[in-house]
UniProtKB/Swiss-Prot annotation:
Limits of the 2Fe-2S ferredoxin-type domain: 299-380
Pathway in which this enzyme or protein is active: Lipid metabolism; fatty acid metabolism
Official protein name in the record: NADPH oxidoreductase
A cellular-component GO term for this protein: plasma membrane
Keyword annotations of the record: 2Fe-2S, Cell membrane, Electron transport, FAD, Flavoprotein, Iron, Iron-sulfur, Membrane, Metal-binding, NAD, Oxidoreductase, Transport
Compartments reported by the entry: Cell membrane
Membrane topology: Peripheral membrane protein
Keyword Metal-binding set for record: yes
Length: 380
């Protein structure tokens, strides 16, 4: 992939990058970046660092794709070597942001880490497993079009859907489709810690050929008596009915449960566990935010400090609108949880895509789950 260098007459706005979520956990690296920026002014530190190593950057996290391995017909695992400043002490179940330059534009999405946090002295590499979605431009490109050697931008690991250490004695994993990805990191970590003592895993996929990590899961079940795997092929057997989960897992109420998958599965799990008074033992991870029906006609979104404006309809998030116009916005989960994307609303009104709530000027809004409700101005 070709590398675009910043010219000497670039403005400060031209060189802005998304705020890296989790940067405050490792202030030392970011202090070094600031020092490098001062020493190399008026040139950018990256103008020098890139000559030594394309993974070195004073303003962002970077990584190199070492390889791509197909998991199923529509999914693949990316092996990524992170560069300077990446922290390998993430927790199993967390996700990272990945930015890829496609057709002259940086496209960002968040994906669950499927690797286990690196032990001291181990190879410094992480993996994410991506399922190509019909509406997902970047996911399709990552699965089918990205080549080894490609340099990507990274956002630090984050997320609260994590496995503690030590792990609880009784565990239940409920996964469906690509919802297995964060749990795969947990399983690999349990193996590394030698903590697979009593784990039940119920996984659903349309067919056996659609099961991500199918061979590895089968090997885990064969090698570890404490890991019991049940795979349901929904095309032939229908969807798992969690109201009858007691038939498969009689002690499910006593188990700490991690569930990840389509919205329907998670909503049913939430209801079943709540009805049983076991909500405190259920941990959910949602890959997409539930949105209300669009209201209004959208409007023109102006990004004040970037000096750019773009027309956006009522169903397009402020983040998507901004990135489409080339504005680099801070981001994290992209689904309204982590609060990394909040900016000040200077003028106009925006609407929360989840609740329909209208936000007034002078408030801070989440750009990933808010849309224009008429013309508006954001302080970024």
């Amino acid at each position: 992939m070709s590398k675009k260098h910043t010219t000497l007459n670039a403005s400060i706005i031209d060189t802005r990058r998304p705020t890296v979520a989790g940067a405050d956990r490792h202030p030392g690296w970011h202090a070094l970046r600031k020092i490098a920026a001062r020493i190399t002014t008026p040139l950018l530190p990256d103008d020098y660092l890139h000559l030594a190593n394309p993974l070195w950057s004073a303003r962002e996290l970077r990584g190199r794709i070492l390889g791509v391995r197909r998991e199923t017909e529509d999914s693949a695992t990316l092996f990524i070597k992170p560069g300077w400043g990446f922290s390998f002490d993430y927790q199993p179940g967390q996700y990272i942001g990945i930015g890829l330059l496609v057709d002259g534009r940086w496209r960002w999405r968040s994906y669950s880490l499927t690797s286990s946090p690196a032990a001291s002295g181990s190879a410094r590499m992480v993996t994410v497993t991506v399922k190509a979605m019909p509406e997902g431009f970047l996911s399709t490109h990552l699965v089918a079009g990205v080549k080894p050697g490609t340099i990507v931008r990274l956002a630090a690991p984050q997320g609260n859907f994590v496995l503690p250490d030590p792990a609880p004695p009784l565990i239940l994993f409920l996964t469906a489709g690509s919802g297995i990805t964060p749990v795969m990191s947990m399983l690999r970590t349990l193996v590394r810690r030698n903590q697979i003592t009593d784990v039940v895993h119920l996984h659903s996929a349309p067919t056996a050929a659609d099961v991500m990590f199918g061979a590895e899961l089968a090997a885990l079940a064969a090698d570890h008596p404490g890991y019991r795997l049940s795979v349901r092929e929904t095309r032939a057997q229908g969807r798992l009915d969690l109201t009858r989960i007691g038939q498969q897992v009689p002690d499910w109420r006593e188990r700490q449960t991690w569930a990840c998958g389509p919205e329907g599965v998670l909503n049913q799990a939430d209801k079943v566990w709540s009805s049983a008074g076991a909500s405190d033992r259920l941990h959910l991870e949602r890959f997409a935010v539930s949105k209300t029906a669009p209201a209004g006609a959208g409007g023109t979104v102006t990004f004040a400090r970037s000096g750019k404006s773009v027309a956006a309809d009522a169903a397009t998030s402020l983040m998507d609108a901004g990135e489409g116009a080339g504005v680099q916005l801070p981001f994290g989960c992209r689904m309204g949880i982590c609060q990394s994307c909040v900016v000040d609303l200077v003028e106009g009104h925006v609407r929360d895509l989840r609740t329909g709530q209208r936000h007034e000027p002078g408030t801070r809004v989440q750009t990933c789950v808010s849309a224009a409700s008429g013309d508006c101005v954001l302080d970024i």
